[in-house]
From Swiss-Prot:
Function as written in the Swiss-Prot or TrEMBL entry: This protein is one of the two subunits of integration host factor, a specific DNA-binding protein that functions in genetic recombination as well as in transcriptional and translational control.
Pfam families according to UniProt: Bac_DNA_binding
Family statement: Belongs to the bacterial histone-like protein family.
Record's protein name: Integration host factor subunit alpha
Keywords: DNA recombination, DNA-binding, Transcription, Transcription regulation, Translation regulation
């Protein structure tokens, strides 16, 4: 089985909720757009029962060019982090090893 895509999510909304395909696709896009806008505005996203998306600042640190071995600085940047919620962790652990 491959990765779950936005198209797969829209198809599921179409099948399970009876939305038409255009509405289902728009709903999925709007969901992710809301998450993007919140993070762009430095607002954490907390999805109860699923997990939290937060922003974290990473400071500059030394790095190395793997081809030449030359030391180069890795610039400071802001990154998105995801922390799974307890319910998600429990569901994943319950199914660990039962599917391949």
């Amino acid at each position: 089985m491959g990765a779950l895509t936005k198209a797969d999510m829209a198809e599921r909304l179409f099948e399970e909720l009876g939305l038409n395909k255009r509405e289902a696709k728009e709903m999925v896009e709007m969901f992710f757009e809301e998450i993007r806008h919140s993070l762009e505005d430095n607002i954490p996203v907390k999805l109860s029962g699923f997990g939290n998306f937060d922003l974290r600042d990473k400071s500059e640190r030394p790095g190395r060019n793997p081809k030449t071995g030359e030391e180069i600085p890795i610039t400071a940047r802001r990154v998105v982090t995801f922390r799974p919620g307890q319910k998600l962790k429990q569901r994943v652990e319950a199914y660990a090893g039962t599917k391949s």
